């Protein structure tokens, strides 16, 4: 009796991810892998091949979509499809979206709604999907179905009879206002209810404000949202209700809509975990990403150095990485650094101080490096190897007969004013950080050969919304709880441009230097 109860409990606790992984194993054992084979139309019309974990995630999705009935989840096929892809930052979630757009187009869907909580994410994603001339465009130059060219268009309002792929890109604020504030040439809720939609929700952890608060409130329709509306206010006003009830389920009417969410950070709140037990289709966290060898290791360097010395210490690492990249023949390599201040005013002051320091830097300014090693704690922890990393850089200087004057000259050449940006716009008069469009463009193609940026000054731009994947160092320019600062030797990225690089040299660069 006890055994029966235990098996029943395990079945009740089973997640969709558990089920689909078990099902995949069974199909593989039965040599029925054709069941989850990727459609030729999808693979042929993407610019890049899939990484192993992307292919696995799509296979999981296909197993779910092609299975008509799930015994462990008897109601799941009686409601609109709602799935979540839980994948680490840098693992290629946008590539997954592109593949799923093609998949659903082949199934007959024509209207796609991409939404997120920040305008700058909307802007950078548009280019990935709709501009064939953009460096990060994810489809082939022409999407072909047989001999027919399939157009892909950015739209503000959907046409009822589209001959191609239509994507509406929007933020939470704009979607809310479109639905509840009727204006000419704007999408209304009635318009959306007349269509079959595939909704792509990026940074999906913002969908769970009401679940975390155990409250499913109705939208307050009296107040229009704008750029000044706080994130908390946006989420409080029913982001979750709007997407799930009004759009996905068409306010209780029959619906064939699809909601696909993407996030690297699903809240650990018990209610949220329960909500997604039958929705998570893949899990690929930072730990797994590191183990695959396609992202940078993360190391924490703590010290009691003053602000200027902390900056110069980071510049040592940047120079060292540059030298290692030259050694291994990695072209157009830029070890971009981010300097984080506590307030906007402090960030402006730190930015100006940095420009002054690098303009006037001398070899003698780096002399502290030979005496301060004792102030760093050595550690066996791979994430806390500041002393070891510094020793490696200094040994490299000695072994290769470099001097600090070479380091100073390199800094002067590579960190001029046009190589450094501050994320807060010079025209911004508000108390919150606001970036102008030109700076956003630079932030979102840091890896481009013609992008000159090597250093970024910011207050709170470590959250989602721009391409943090290209960072190699995050340097805190204010005191922490222990009274000192820290340099996090960081970086998280899966870059298509390095697919053909020799894997050992790519790994060596970061395992040695970060």
UniProtKB/Swiss-Prot annotation:
Cofactor(s) needed for function: Mg(2+); S-adenosyl-L-methionine
Highest taxon in the source lineage: Bacteria
SUPFAM superfamilies xrefs: P-loop containing nucleoside triphosphate hydrolases
A Pfam short name: ResIII
Enzyme class: hydrolase
Enzyme Commission numbers on file: 3.1.21.5
GO terms (BP aspect): DNA restriction-modification system
Keyword Nucleotide-binding: yes
Domain remark from Swiss-Prot or TrEMBL: Has a helicase-type domain in its N-terminus and an endonuclease-type domain in its C-terminus.
Known function: A type III restriction enzyme that recognizes 2 inversely oriented double-stranded sequences 5'-CGAAT-3' and cleaves 25-27 base pairs downstream. After binding to one recognition site undergoes random one-dimensional diffusion along DNA until it collides with a stationary enzyme bound to the second DNA site, which is when DNA cleavage occurs. DNA restriction requires both the Res and Mod subunits.
Name recorded for this polypeptide: Probable type III restriction-modification enzyme HindVIP Res subunit
Protein's gene: res
């Amino acid at each position: 009796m006890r055994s029966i109860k235990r098996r029943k409990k395990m079945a009740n606790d089973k997640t969709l991810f558990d089920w689909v992984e078990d099902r995949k194993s069974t199909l593989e054992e039965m040599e029925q892998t054709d069941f989850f084979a990727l459609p030729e139309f999808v693979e042929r019309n993407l610019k890049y091949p899939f990484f192993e974990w992307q292919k696995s995630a799509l296979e999981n999705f296909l197993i779910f979509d092609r299975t008509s009935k799930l015994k462990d989840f008897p109601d799941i096929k009686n409601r609109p499809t709602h799935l979540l892809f839980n994948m680490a930052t840098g693992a290629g979630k946008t590539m997954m979206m592109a593949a799923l757009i093609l998949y659903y187009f082949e199934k007959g869907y024509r209207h796609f709604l991409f939404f997120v909580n920040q305008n700058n994410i909307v802007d950078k994603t548009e280019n990935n999907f709709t501009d064939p001339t953009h460096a990060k465009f994810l489809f082939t130059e022409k999407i072909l179905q047989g001999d027919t060219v399939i157009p892909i268009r950015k739209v503000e309002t959907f046409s009822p009879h589209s001959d191609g792929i239509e994507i509406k890109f929007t933020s939470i604020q704009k979607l809310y206002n479109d639905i509840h504030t009727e204006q000419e040439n704007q999408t209304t809720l009635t318009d959306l209810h007349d269509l079959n939609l595939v909704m792509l929700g990026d940074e999906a952890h913002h969908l769970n404000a009401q679940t975390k608060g155990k409250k499913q409130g109705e939208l307050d329709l009296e107040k229009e949202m704008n750029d000044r509306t706080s994130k908390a206010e946006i989420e409080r006003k029913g982001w979750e209700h709007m997407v799930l009830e009004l759009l996905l389920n068409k306010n209780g009417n029959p619906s064939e809509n699809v909601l696909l969410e993407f996030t690297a950070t699903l809240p650990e709140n018990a209610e949220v975990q329960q909500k997604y037990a039958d929705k998570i289709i893949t899990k690929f966290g930072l730990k797994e990403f590191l183990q695959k060898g396609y992202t940078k290791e993360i190391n924490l360097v703590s010290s009691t150095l003053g602000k200027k010395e902390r900056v110069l210490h980071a510049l040592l690492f940047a120079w060292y990485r540059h030298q290692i990249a030259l050694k291994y023949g990695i072209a157009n390599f830029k070890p971009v650094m981010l300097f984080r201040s506590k307030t906007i005013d402090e960030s402006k002051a730190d930015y100006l101080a940095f420009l002054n320091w690098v303009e006037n830097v001398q070899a003698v300014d780096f002399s502290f490096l030979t005496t301060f090693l004792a102030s760093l704690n050595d550690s066996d922890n791979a994430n806390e190897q500041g002393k070891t990393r510094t020793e490696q850089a200094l040994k490299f200087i000695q072994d290769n007969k470099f001097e600090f004057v070479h380091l100073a000259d390199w800094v002067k050449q590579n960190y001029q004013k046009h190589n450094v940006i501050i994320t807060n716009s010079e025209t911004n008069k508000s108390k919150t950080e606001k970036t102008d469009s030109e700076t956003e463009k630079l932030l979102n193609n840091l890896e481009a050969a013609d992008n000159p940026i090597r250093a970024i000054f910011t207050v709170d731009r470590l959250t989602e919304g721009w391409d943090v994947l290209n960072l190699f160092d995050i340097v805190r320019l204010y005191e922490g709880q222990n009274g000192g600062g820290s340099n996090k030797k960081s970086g998280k990225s899966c870059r298509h441009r390095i697919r053909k690089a020799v894997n050992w040299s790519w790994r060596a660069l970061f395992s040695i230097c970060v």
